[in-house]
A protein has these predicted regions:
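Surface-exposed beta-strand edges and their flanking turn/coil or helix-capping segments
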Residues: 22, 32-34, 43-45, 71-75, ...
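Long protein-protein interaction modules used by eukaryotic assembly/scaffold proteins
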Residues: 70-157
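Broad, structure-driven detector of short, well-ordered beta-strand segments within folded domains
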Residues: 5-9, 65-73
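N-terminal "first-domain core" detector
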Residues: 1-39
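Short, well-structured hydrophobic secondary-structure segments
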Residues: 31-70
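Short acidic, glycine-rich loop/turn motifs
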Residues: 21-23, 60-62, 84
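A short, compositionally biased
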Residues: 12-17, 52-53, 74-77
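Alpha-helical interaction segments
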Residues: 6, 32, 59, 137-138
Length: 157
């Protein structure tokens, strides 16, 4: 199991973002389009995992490629699979795994919070909206932070 993960979300044109994720084993960059609520969906999946769900998912549409994040949790351990698919409606088994990692759920939450805090700091929320085309996912980010803090205090409610 790896001890850490790093994630970077970079806006690179109106409605487009690159998301780089890495651990000690590998690094991969995927693309997201604003045609879906990629950051909100991603943050919601992480929040649900931190809350205690055994499996959650998020999907980035890169037109025409789709990147599917699959999160699993057992106890305090998380396993992440990132798949590349031709279409968003394709079954997981039609995808190619391009990155995976096992880490403590705290390391996942910390990396995701740090990533989106950095996005808010770098772009400012109004600039983010202008570049991405949608509001910054403040509500979803704060949900991850609140659930992670509750998890750290031993109150998984």
């Amino acid at each position: 199991m790896t001890t850490g993960m790093r994630m970077v979300w970079t806006l690179n044109g109106h409605g487009w973002a690159n998301c780089t994720v890495e651990d000690q084993q590998a690094k991969v960059e995927v693309t997201a389009s604003y045609v879906t609520n990629a950051p909100e969906e991603f943050l919601t999946a992480v929040a649900r995992l931190v809350f205690g769900e055994a499996e959650t998912r998020a999907q980035f549409e890169a037109e025409p490629t789709t990147f599917r994040w699959i999160f699993y949790r057992q106890g305090d351990d998380a396993w992440i699979r990132l798949l590349r698919l031709r279409r968003g409606s394709d079954h997981d088994n039609k995808g190619t795994e391009i990155w995976s990692s096992q880490l403590h759920v705290d390391a996942l939450a910390r990396a995701v919070i740090r990533c989106f805090d950095e996005v808010a700091w770098t772009y400012d929320e109004s600039v983010y909206r202008g570049k991405w085309g949608e509001h910054f996912p403040r509500t979803e980010l704060e949900a991850v932070r609140r659930l992670w803090n509750a998890h750290l205090q031993g109150d998984d409610t």
